[in-house]
């Protein structure tokens, strides 16, 4: 028999075109990325039982829908199209969803008189679904001989469980189930072995549950439960928060005994991890004064390392088990905390396509894991808010820093503002268009600047040429004017010095006589000078 593990989330992603058609029929539009984010990050944080891998349980879907459509600041209107589409998948399931949707139970009164046919699929409440390729076993005769009356094992009173006062607790194996399990995960919800009553609203999926005669009956973990829990979750060292949440849900819903807790820890944790968890749990034991105690008798009484003789049939034994589970959870939380390392908290930054809510959850998880501080503590809200602003995406962080009256803003206010900024981000197509437009504008400005510089250069060259031409023309005009002013012609007996007639210049009485002074010598510059 071959099998492949799938989940409601992966199932919807494999049939994404069908999901979009269903959303279109609801007059809404859904995006694949936000579908995954809401299913695996947002809705599990509502604390209504929504698993990380999605579910087709209508009750859980309606609880998430009530949270999403809540009026006022606590609502999430951007998530309405997605939860409405989830709801439509259950109300009008396509063929690939029908095997995983809970059918309406048949009345028990009609069962004793009808021969049992092929095993019907019981309501599926598991986080994971396994698609099996069933083999066809040979049919065997299941009716009593001679047409005798059928006995409904589900309504028959179970045998009394003798009260246990001392000695080891004896585990009783369950009677043969009425339904054959459709997948290995079925035994996670043990209520499938008993069809729910019409007026029943509480789950019966407990290892310890009330039998027909008022006695508690014990149903141990199945190997398929432990196998799937171990293989579908990260190790405690890799992600202590996720594994702690799984164990917490198992302790809450299954109400395991001391032996079950040891089996659970031995399967999901390594030997070193288990010892660390047990040590932290024993440190959390409190004395009569409400303070942590180290008295061996009180520690061993509340959290024993050896198998105790607690009788789950008595109120005292059940109280011991409740306290033991609480201490075990405290040990898991304390052991999951790493040494204080604020540098690792600062490395948590918002991804390019990560929503602010998802980023805040990762940031809080880093605070829980790498610091001793509780991010939910009101006294730490300022530190978490500053980390949220500084480590957000650059465009979101810049706008958050410019908010008016930033000091009075709560962490919830900052997340809402960041969501608005995130939702108004441009799409990749818009970003490409903006970059193309900016490039064209930049190129246009560059061409205009080049043309302006060329025009300025031409004007400067024209001015220089005009000056040069003006100089040449002026020189030519002066030369022409100078050529016209020639010396006047002298007569034969006219003096060139005094311009009088009757003598020449050398005999001019008006010309000064006497020795000539030395001519001034013109100094020449040499290369040395």
UniProtKB/Swiss-Prot annotation:
The record marks 129-130, 206-207, 469-470 as: Cleavage. A zinc finger (CCHC-type) spans 493-510. One of its GO terms (biological process) is virion assembly. Residues 429-467 form a coiled coil. A motif (PPXY motif) lies at residues 176-179. It comes from the Viruses. Signal peptide: none annotated. Residues 116-211, 425-529 are annotated as: Disordered. Residues 157-167 have a biased composition (Low complexity). GO terms for molecular function: RNA binding; structural constituent of virion; zinc ion binding. The keyword Lipoprotein applies. It holds the Pfam family Gag_p12. GO terms for cellular component: host cell plasma membrane; membrane; viral nucleocapsid. A lipid is attached at residue 2 (N-myristoyl glycine). Keywords: Capsid protein, Coiled coil, Host cell membrane, Host membrane, Lipoprotein, Membrane, Metal-binding, Myristate, Phosphoprotein, RNA-binding, Viral matrix protein, Viral nucleoprotein, Virion, Zinc, Zinc-finger. Residues 187-196, 425-457, 477-490, 498-510 have a biased composition (Basic and acidic residues). This is Gag polyprotein. It comes from Duplan murine leukemia virus. The gene is gag.
